[in-house]
Amino acid sequence: MEIFMPKLRSATSTQGRNMAGARSLWRATGMKEGDFGKPIIAVVNSFTQFVPGHVHLHDIGQMVVKQIEAAGGVAKEFNTIAVDDGIAMGHGGMLYSLPSRDLIADSVEYMVNAHCADAMVCISNCDKITPGMLMAAMRLNIPTIFVSGGPMEAGKTKLSDQLIKLDLIDAMIQSADKNVSDSDVDAIERSACPTCGSCSGMFTANSMNCLTEALGLSLPGNGSCLATHADRKQLFLDAATQIVELCKRHYEQDDYSVLPRSIATKAAFENAMSLDIAMGGSTNTVLHLLAVAQEAEVDFTMADIDRLSRIVPCLSKVAPNTNKYHMEDVHRAGGVMAILGELDRANLLHHDTKTVLGLTFAEQLAKYDIKLTRDEAVKTFYRSGPAGIRTTEAFSQDCRWETLDDDRENGCIRDKAHAYSQDGGLAMLSGNIALDGCIVKTAGVDESILKFTGEAIVFESQEDAVDGILGGKVKAGHVVVIRYEGPKGGPGMQEMLYPTSYLKSMGLGKACALLTDGRFSGGTSGLSIGHCSPEAASGGTIGLVRNGDIIAIDIPNRSIQLQVSDEELATRRAEQDVKGWKPANRAREVSFALKVFGHFATSADKGAVRDKTKL
C-alpha cells in the first residue's frame, strides 16, 4: 500500500521547471542549491522601538534564523506591527489597539500563504500581538511554536525610606492622586518600568504568554522567565530546534498531531481558561481565547467560561491584584507549570492534552513542575531572577534567587487547600443588562463589594467618564456606566484603565462600581465589569440605562440586574430604535479603517471577531 506523505507547502514555489523564476528570487534572498527541498520556516518577529515589550527583539529574530538553519531548516524572518496599549491609553490611539489584533492575524496569514511557508516560530510579547499570531496559527494550521519576549522586571524604589515594588499602574494611579508629592510621582515614573519586556504584573501580555503554555503551543517557562535573563535565550534556541523537529514529524512522518489545531483542542482551551481563572489573569484573555477558538473551529464559548469559573479556585495573586508579587515571583514559584500542577492535583486539568514538545501535560509536568521534578536544571531555571539594572538588552543578566518559592500554603502560588479563594479569579455575570454576559476579574475585587447596589451615572464615552470622575461628578455608591465603547460602538473597544485608575486616585476604588461594553487593561482591579454584551451599539440593554437607575451586582451568584421594569425598558428601546443606537453628543473622529473594523465587529461575547455573515 502506497503511503502519501504531506508535501512541503514550499514545494509549490521551489520545485519544478516552471518555478525557475520563483527559485531565482529565492536564490536572491540567500538560498543555496541544497536548501531547496528543506522546510521553509517563517520567523514571525514583532520588533519595534515603540514598545518596551518588543524593543529587545531586533537581533533575536536572526538568532532564531541561524539556529533553525543549523538544525536543518531554511528560515525567513518578517515583522508584524505592535501597539503599546500603555502608550496608546487615554486618547484616540486606544481605538486602534484591538483592531490591530485582527490586522496582525491577517498580515501573518498573508505573508505565510503568499510565500508558502511550511512552519512558523512566532516571536510575540505584548497585548494584541500574541492573540493575533495565535489566530493566524489556527487559520494556517502548520507546525508553530510561540516564544515571547518575556516579562519586564518589577520596578523598585524607596518612598518614605521604604523599598516598594512598582509597575506601570502605580505610575498612572499616583500621578492623579493630589496627595502624592511631585517628587514621589517623579520617583515612581522613573522606576516603574525599569527594563525591556512586557509590563511586570499579570496584565494582558503576560496573561496571554502564560496561556500559550497551557494551550501547549510554547515551551515551559515561556510565560514567566524574565526578558533580561540569560535563561530566556535558551528558550529561543530550543524553539528554533524543535520547530525543525515538528516539520520532520509532520512532513516526513505523516504526523498530524503536531499541528496547532491538534494541540489546541477543546480540552486545551479549557486548560488555558482554567489557568487564567486560577492566576487571576486579565479579562482581555477571555476576549482573545474566544477569538482564537473560533479560528481553530473549536466550540468554546462564554458558557464554558462560566462553568469553569465556578469550579476553579484562585491559586495565584499577582499585581495588579496585590502589590506583593510580580511575574518574577511567579517564575520563582515555578511559573505556569507549577499552577497547572496544582490544578492537576485538584483534578481540574485535562492532563492528556499534548504540547509542542510531543509530551502529554502529565509527562511535561513530571519534568517541569518544581514540586515533582528531580531535574536540578529545571529547578535552577526557575530560580532565575531580576538584576535590578535598567536596560533594554535581552539576556543581559544571570542573577538567581537563592531558593525557590515552593511554599504552597503561604507563597506566591498556592495549592487548592490554601487557595486565595475557592472562587476563581475571573467570573462571568449575566442578567437583563447583559443578556450575553459580561466579565469581572474577581481576584481584584475587595471582598466588601462582591455584592454592590448603586445608582447609575451614565457616560457616552471614556473621555466624558474621565472628566466626570476627575471633576467630582462621581460619588461613593455610584455605578459608573461607560457605553458605546464596544467593538462596534467605539469602534475598537477601548480599555478603561484611566477611569478605573482615577477612581482609585479619588479614593473611590472600593466605593463605586464600573460597568462598560468596552474592556479593561490587564492592569485594572476593583469592581470593574467589562465586555457587557450585547454592546450598546448593537442594541444592548446597557444603551437603555439612565442616570439614577439602580443596578444590582451580585458576584457570588453571578448576577447583574438593571432594576427597571420590562415595560419601561420596552418604551426606552422603542425610543432608541428611532435614534439609531448612537451615542448622544459625542464628538469623535473615526478613520475609515476603524469604521471598517466597526462594521464587521461582533460583540465581546463572540471575541469581537469579524461577523462572517456580513460577507
Swiss-Prot record:
It comes from Mannheimia succiniciproducens (strain KCTC 0769BP / MBEL55E). The gene is ilvD. GO terms for biological process: isoleucine biosynthetic process; L-valine biosynthetic process. PROSITE patterns: ILVD_EDD_1, ILVD_EDD_2. Mg(2+) binds at D85, D127, K128, E495. Pathway: Amino-acid biosynthesis; L-isoleucine biosynthesis; L-isoleucine from 2-oxobutanoate: step 3/4; Amino-acid biosynthesis; L-valine biosynthesis; L-valine from pyruvate: step 3/4. Its EC number is 4.2.1.9. Its cofactor is [2Fe-2S] cluster; Mg(2+). [2Fe-2S] cluster binds at C126, C199. The lineage of its organism: Bacteria, Pseudomonadati, Pseudomonadota, Gammaproteobacteria, Pasteurellales. The active site is at S521 (proton acceptor). One of its GO terms (molecular function) is dihydroxy-acid dehydratase activity. Functions in the biosynthesis of branched-chain amino acids. Catalyzes the dehydration of (2R,3R)-2,3-dihydroxy-3-methylpentanoate (2,3-dihydroxy-3-methylvalerate) into 2-oxo-3-methylpentanoate (2-oxo-3-methylvalerate) and of (2R)-2,3-dihydroxy-3-methylbutanoate (2,3-dihydroxyisovalerate) into 2-oxo-3-methylbutanoate (2-oxoisovalerate), the penultimate precursor to L-isoleucine and L-valine, respectively. Binds 1 [2Fe-2S] cluster per subunit. This cluster acts as a Lewis acid cofactor. The modification N6-carboxylysine is found at K128. Homodimer. This is Dihydroxy-acid dehydratase. GO terms for cellular component: cytosol.
